[in-house]
């Protein structure tokens, strides 16, 4: 293999730049040319493809976002559109592709693989919802951003004796909410993977108030439902002074943590190794702190699951 491509797709995550850097430097170390595909699959279709050199990835390992930009591209689901993308890759002499992104990005890589073009997926999403890996690039940074925000909100919640409902990202996965809620001692954590009873939430808050608790923190993953509606329900049922904070896209930004920089470097380099070895149609990950790779089609057939033990622990510690 003499030439590979790299793109980032879907929602950005801190550490994507570190992964791009690793792909470029690892490939050049092995005398392989690297071409960057800008704006994800949309850029692949339009041919926005440029050669990357060592200097192209200098001074980016510590930066959030993605140097290659990103975009969502629903039209890539069309086989004819994907063929246009493959034609662009072949036009530029690209023999293998590294795709950095989340579930939708993996779906695109899977489809390209099924159409005969070798791809390797690298998990880049703050949601931590990709099968085949314990952690995704960006999750740790986002988690620390959320924890810092909740720490600050708890300060004002304590001062004003208020209940705060804090919404974090996670349409289908509650990892950010669960980990942040546990780390910050939240009184209640609501995640998409686990059903909840609003009356039970109310009862828990009232029990806390009866034993002298003056403030509470409730962490809600966005996939559970409207945090605003939850906050209104709590205030109406308890008369507690209640506020709602939606953290939003601040969770996606910022300089990546050391853990995300190292993880991205390891996974990006491993993706190149797989392409060099002729092992396309794979996705890389980390499990028990060891690099692993899986068949991307088989990996996508799996479903992300929450850590049940951690969820149970969060309930036991929030009595």
Swiss-Prot record:
Q: Supply the EC number(s).
A: 2.7.1.11
Give the source's domain of life in one word.
Bacteria
| Record's keyword annotation contains Magnesium | yes
* Stored PROSITE patterns: PHOSPHOFRUCTOKINASE (PS00433)
Q: Which reaction does it catalyse?
A: beta-D-fructose 6-phosphate + ATP = beta-D-fructose 1,6-bisphosphate + ADP + H(+)
Q: Could you state a single Gene Ontology molecular function term?
A: 6-phosphofructokinase activity
User: What's a single GO CC term here?
Assistant: cytoplasm
Its assembly, as annotated, is: Homotetramer.
The positions annotated for binding ADP are 21-25, 154, 185-187, 211, 213-215
Residues that hold ATP according to the record: 11, 72-73, 102-105
One GO biological process this protein is involved in is: fructose 6-phosphate metabolic process
Name its pathway.
Carbohydrate degradation; glycolysis; D-glyceraldehyde 3-phosphate and glycerone phosphate from D-glucose: step 3/4
Q: Which UniProt keywords apply?
A: Allosteric enzyme, ATP-binding, Cytoplasm, Glycolysis, Kinase, Magnesium, Metal-binding, Nucleotide-binding, Transferase
Q: What cofactors are annotated for this protein?
A: Mg(2+)
The residues annotated as the active site are 127
Please give the family membership noted in the entry: Belongs to the phosphofructokinase type A (PFKA) family. ATP-dependent PFK group I subfamily. Prokaryotic clade 'B1' sub-subfamily.
Read off the lineage from the record.
Answer: Bacteria, Bacillati, Bacillota, Bacilli, Bacillales
Kindly list the places in or outside the cell where this protein is found, as annotated in its UniProt entry.
Cytoplasm
| Binding-site list for substrate | 125-127, 162, 169-171, 222, 243, 249-252
Keyword check for ATP-binding:
yes
What the protein does comes down to: Catalyzes the phosphorylation of D-fructose 6-phosphate to fructose 1,6-bisphosphate by ATP, the first committing step of glycolysis.
Quote the Gene3D superfamilies the UniProt record gives: 3.40.50.450, Phosphofructokinase domain
Protein encoded by which gene: pfkA
What name does this protein carry? ATP-dependent 6-phosphofructokinase
**InterPro entries, alphabetized:** ATP_PFK, ATP_PFK_prok-type, PFKA_ATP_prok, Phosphofructokinase_CS, Phosphofructokinase_dom, PKF_sf
Free-text activity regulation comment from the record: Allosterically activated by ADP and other diphosphonucleosides, and allosterically inhibited by phosphoenolpyruvate.
Which residues hold Mg(2+)?
103
């Amino acid at each position: 293999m003499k030439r590979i491509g790299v793109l980032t797709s879907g929602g950005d995550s801190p550490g994507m730049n570190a992964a791009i850097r690793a792909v470029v430097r690892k490939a050049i170390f092995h005398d392989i040319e690297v071409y960057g595909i800008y704006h994800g699959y949309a850029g692949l279709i339009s041919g926005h493809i440029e050669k990357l050199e060592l200097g192209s990835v200098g001074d980016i390992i510590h930066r959030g976002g993605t140097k290659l930009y990103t975009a969502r591209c629903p039209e890539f689901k069309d086989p004819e559109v994907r063929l246009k993308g493959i034609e662009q890759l072949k036009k530029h002499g690209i023999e293998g592709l590294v795709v950095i992104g989340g579930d939708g990005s993996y779906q695109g890589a899977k489809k390209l693989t099924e159409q005969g073009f070798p791809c390797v997926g690298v998990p880049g999403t703050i949601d931590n919802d990709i099968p085949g890996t314990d952690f995704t690039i960006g999750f740790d940074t986002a988690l620390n951003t959320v924890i810092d925000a909740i720490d600050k909100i708890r300060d004002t919640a304590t001062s004003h004796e208020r209940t705060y409902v804090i919404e974090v990202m996670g349409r289908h996965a509650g990892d950010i909410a669960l980990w942040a809620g546990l780390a910050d001692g939240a009184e209640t954590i609501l995640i998409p993977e686990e059903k909840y009873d609003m009356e039970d939430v109310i009862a828990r808050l009232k029990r806390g108030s009866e034993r002298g608790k003056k403030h509470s923190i409730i962490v809600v993953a966005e996939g559970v439902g409207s945090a605003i509606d939850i906050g209104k329900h709590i205030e109406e049922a308890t008369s507690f002074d209640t506020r709602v904070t939606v953290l939003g896209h601040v969770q996606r930004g910022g300089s990546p943590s050391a853990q995300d920089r190292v993880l991205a470097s390891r996974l990006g380099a491993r993706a190149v190794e797989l392409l060099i070895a002729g092992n396309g149609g794979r996705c890389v990950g980390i499990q028990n702190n060891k690099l692993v790779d899986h068949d991307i089609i088989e990996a996508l057939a799996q479903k992300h699951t929450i850590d049940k033990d951690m969820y149970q622990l969060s309930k036991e510690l929030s009595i």
